[in-house]
């Protein structure tokens, strides 16, 4: 289970794990099939069951990234639990046949582990912490250095204030690394 805010690298880590598992002979394909749970909103239960089954078949020989990291899912009361139950049913029919990496937003890790009876194969939880102000500044500096650019003292001062406002609250820090990369790209394009 990988937990953390958006743009913290959960998908990247899943792809690295897939390549490692392929190199070790655990899986035949070093591929990750990314299954966004939000696309199931509004489906009838049999359609949702079929959708999960198709995702498992497509990921066969590789890894299924079961991605619950979407703000849309917060609005659908009980949806996560129903989808998890469908996934557990599919896994119970073919025990040991699938490798699933479960990605969820920060502070929701207790959800899937709550069904320990059916989730005994989940042994590791990796938490992706939000970036600090210093780490976000490093992301910006590295991006600018790739383009052989440097910030002036004034620019660094403005960016320090901007980054401070990004991490001021948990809501604001959500996807801050993605935003920092976008800001860096805008600076590069406009200079």
Regions found by a protein language model. Give the residues of each.
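Walker A/P-loop
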Residues: 1-30, 54-57
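Substrate-engagement module of ASCE P-loop NTPases
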Residues: 56-58, 83-98, 143
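A short helix-turn-beta junction within AAA+ P-loop NTPase domains corresponding to the substrate/partner-engaging
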Residues: 112-130
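Conserved nucleotide-binding/hydrolysis micro-motifs of P-loop NTPases
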Residues: 6-8, 39-41, 70-72, 105-110, ...
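Conserved AAA+ ATPase small/helical "lid" subdomain
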Residues: 126, 130-132, 137-191
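Conserved ATPase-coupling elements of RecA-like P-loop NTPase cores
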Residues: 44-48, 70-84, 95, 111-113
């Amino acid at each position: 289970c990988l937990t953390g805010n958006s743009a913290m690298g959960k998908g990247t880590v899943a792809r690295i794990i897939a390549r490692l598992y392929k190199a070790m002979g655990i899986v035949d394909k070093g591929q990750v099939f990314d299954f966004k749970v939000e696309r199931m909103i509004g489906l009838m239960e049999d359609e949702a069951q079929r959708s999960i089954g198709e995702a498992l078949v497509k990921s066969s020989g590789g890894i299924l990234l079961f991605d619950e990291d979407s703000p849309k899912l917060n609005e659908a009361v009980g949806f996560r639990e129903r989808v998890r139950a469908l996934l557990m049913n599919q896994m119970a029919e073919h025990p040991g046949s699938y490798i699933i990496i479960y990605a969820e937003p920060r502070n929701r890790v207790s959800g899937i582990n709550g069904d320990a009876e059916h989730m005994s194969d989940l042994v590791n939880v990796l938490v992706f912490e939000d970036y600090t102000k210093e780490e976000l500044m490093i992301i910006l500096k590295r991006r600018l250095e790739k383009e052989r650019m440097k910030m002036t003292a004034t620019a660094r001062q403005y960016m320090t204030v901007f980054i401070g406002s990004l991490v001021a609250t948990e809501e604001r820090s959500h996807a801050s690394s993605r935003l920092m990369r976008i800001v860096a790209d805008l600076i590069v394009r406009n200079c």
